[in-house]
């Protein structure tokens, strides 16, 4: 599904990512690790099509509409409710039965009681859980998750553990995390950036 050959990214004279090469088959799970500033976020943005490589070749064999991206920004509308946000994204992605799918995800991630609350009133952890719902709403073939456990309490992190275990082998997943032990058992490949 993904082939990267000597992929680099520069911003002006700053090299944000240096000569990364890897392959990931459909259904695989790539765990990207490395210290702050090593290029993890840059690589995930490249995979999501939000940036283009300066050098090298990057091939992602997935339709853009079949990609789910969770970055550092939640990409949610603060003035809309949780349910309205998911219904909006459901329309954009043409999700059949979007209200039912949104309700199921809100229930799964412990947000059903807050479904009619404006996102601007949410805690950081609630916002992260809703962003995960948004990312999973259209059942993407490729999930690109940048620090998905960020701001999650233990209960929500355990929910995400279960979700990732359920997706293992059925979806292609690329994720970065400061807690690699959480997902090491699911990873079919590991990429350590320096």
Identify the residue ranges that each predicted region occupies.
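Conserved structural motif at the start of ABC-family nucleotide-binding domains
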Residues: 2, 17-19
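The feature captures the beta-strand-to-loop junction immediately N-terminal to the Walker
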Residues: 33-35
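Helix-to-loop junction immediately C-terminal to a conserved catalytic motif
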Residues: 48
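Conserved ABC ATPase "signature" region
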Residues: 87, 97-114
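Catalytic Walker B motif of ABC-type/P-loop ATPase nucleotide-binding domains
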Residues: 143-147
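Helix N-cap at the start of a conserved alpha-helix in ABC-type nucleotide-binding domains
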Residues: 154-156
